[in-house]
From Swiss-Prot:
Monomer. GO terms for molecular function: ATP binding; tRNA dimethylallyltransferase activity. ATP binds at residues 13-20. One of its GO terms (biological process) is tRNA modification. This is tRNA dimethylallyltransferase. Its EC number is 2.5.1.75. It comes from Cytophaga hutchinsonii (strain ATCC 33406 / DSM 1761 / CIP 103989 / NBRC 15051 / NCIMB 9469 / D465).
Length: 304
């Protein structure tokens, strides 16, 4: 189905940059819906640690890929691409514009440009990597990844074992780094895109990240982690915001150190997000306070 005069407005950027607020504002302006391109917000059980928009923050705007499935179910970028394109087909029947908002770069790329062809996962090799993880720990394995594929090491979530395993797996299968499979070939989409990136001076961003982590802890982040501790080995919980709390629960460090790690790792995650999105030349960057400038830019693009 072709939607040559339909637009996807994409809002990307690092964690705590204000993406959700902008997406809701734009959705209300264009009377449309928001698709969340976030690999963890899709899970019903995870709300505080994923910075999921509350019903109040959603402000009546329909949100998709939020609270969609249980953490016991699997979800990945390929599924997001397939289901997202199907959903856009439906939404474009009544909307000229749809908003996509999120910080998971691979999900955004999959939806807008398609996925790079990669070798299929090898179950035996994956099992071997799991055993190595138990024996060596994640830090040693991320060190190995840095040696064999520094480009991938610079952009993936290093707190996420599945991402690290996959990169090492591809190298061991093929002798080539995962980054070498990224051809840059883009699949044609039947809609146009307007890509907005939010960023600010690093000191300001880091202060926002620290304040938001304080609010998350006040809102019950530790309880959320404890409530889901039976799923701690699931991909979604082996990420920033949860793994640090599990370390505290395990007695590896005290609460003060837990908070320090939560903030430090969130800042590191933001840096990796910026590294990823900065490679997309189509993204037009703004400070989140530049609402008028953002709106003017979008309106001009829609008139082209």
């Amino acid at each position: 189905m072709s939607f040559i005069n339909k637009y996807v407005i994409v809002v990307v950027g690092p964690t705590a940059a204000g993406k959700t607020a902008l997406a809701v504002s734009l959705a209300k302006r264009f009377n449309t819906a928001v698709l969340s391109a976030d690999s963890r917000q899709v899970f019903k059980e995870l709300s505080i640690g994923t910075a999921k928009a509350t019903m109040e923050e959603q402000d009546g705007v329909p949100h998709y890929f939020v609270d969609s499935i249980s953490i016991e179910e699997s979800f990945n970028a390929g599924m997001f691409e397939r289901e997202g394109l199907q959903l856009l087909d439906t939404l474009f029947l009544k909307h000229d514009v749809v908003i996509v908002c999120g910080g998971t770069g691979l999900y955004v790329k999959a939806l807008l440009e398609g996925m790079d062809a990669l070798p299929q996962a090898d179950p035996e090799l994956r099992e071997a990597l799991n055993r190595e993880f138990e024996q060596r720990g994640l830090e040693v394995m991320t060190g190995e990844l840095k040696e064999i594929d520094p480009e991938t090491h610079a952009v993936i979530d290093l707190k996420n074992p599945l991402r690290v395993f996959r990169a090492i797996e591809v190298y061991r299968q093929t002798g080539k780094p995962l980054s070498s499979f990224k051809t840059g070939a883009k699949q044609e989409r039947p809609f146009k895109t307007i890509r907005i990136g939010l960023n600010m001076p690093r000191e300001e961003l880091y202060a926002r990240i620290d304040r938001r982590m304080d609010r998350m802890l006040e809102a019950g982040l530790e309880k959320e982690a404890r409530d889901n501790i039976q799923y701690r080995n699931y991909n979604a919980l082996q990420t920033v915001g949860y793994s640090e709390i599990f370390g505290f629960i395990d007695g590896l460090y005290d609460r003060e150190e837990m908070i320090r790690l939560l903030k430090r790792n969130s800042r590191r995650y933001a840096k990796r997000q910026l590294t990823w999105f900065s490679k997309d030349a189509e993204v037009k960057w703004f400070h989140p306070g530049e609402i008028t400038e953002i709106t003017t830019f979008i309106e001009a693009k829609l008139q082209e």
